[in-house]
């Protein structure tokens, strides 16, 4: 069924909660360091983060660890700033996880509707009628 395909795929590559959190957290850390992030600096970071997040979900909290290399190379984050990013990420990770799971469910419903398949099996429908 559609759900059997979409939900595991979404758990692997759909990490909207982590991505949003990491972008906003990196902007906050940059501003605390006295640097104002611009659209020209953030757009390449967001694109690279999107690619990185596909490979990140192998371990819990893996997104922030995969992002540290980008932050160091693109924004010259120091080890203190990287530690702050890890702390911020772990403090709010449950909210990002809730966003990811809700998004996966919504995408599964949309794909199910797109292919005009019911999420209720025929056997269950017969038992209801």
Give the residues covered by each predicted segment.
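Hydrophobic transmembrane alpha-helical segments of multi-pass transport and channel proteins
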Residues: 12-20, 50-62, 78, 90-106
């Amino acid at each position: 069924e559609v759900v059997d395909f979409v939900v595991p795929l979404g758990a692997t590559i759909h990490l909207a909660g982590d991505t949003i959190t990491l972008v906003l957290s990196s902007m906050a850390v940059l501003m605390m360091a006295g640097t104002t992030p611009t659209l020209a600096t953030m757009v390449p970071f967001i694109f690279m983060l999107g690619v990185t997040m596909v490979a990140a979900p192998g371990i819990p909290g893996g997104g922030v660890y995969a992002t540290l290399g980008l932050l160091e190379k693109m924004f010259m984050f120091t080890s203190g700033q990287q530690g702050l990013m890890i702390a911020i990420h772990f403090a709010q990770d449950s909210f990002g996880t809730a966003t990811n799971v809700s998004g996966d469910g919504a995408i599964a419903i949309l794909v199910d509707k797109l292919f005009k398949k019911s999420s209720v099996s025929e056997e269950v429908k017969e038992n209801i009628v």
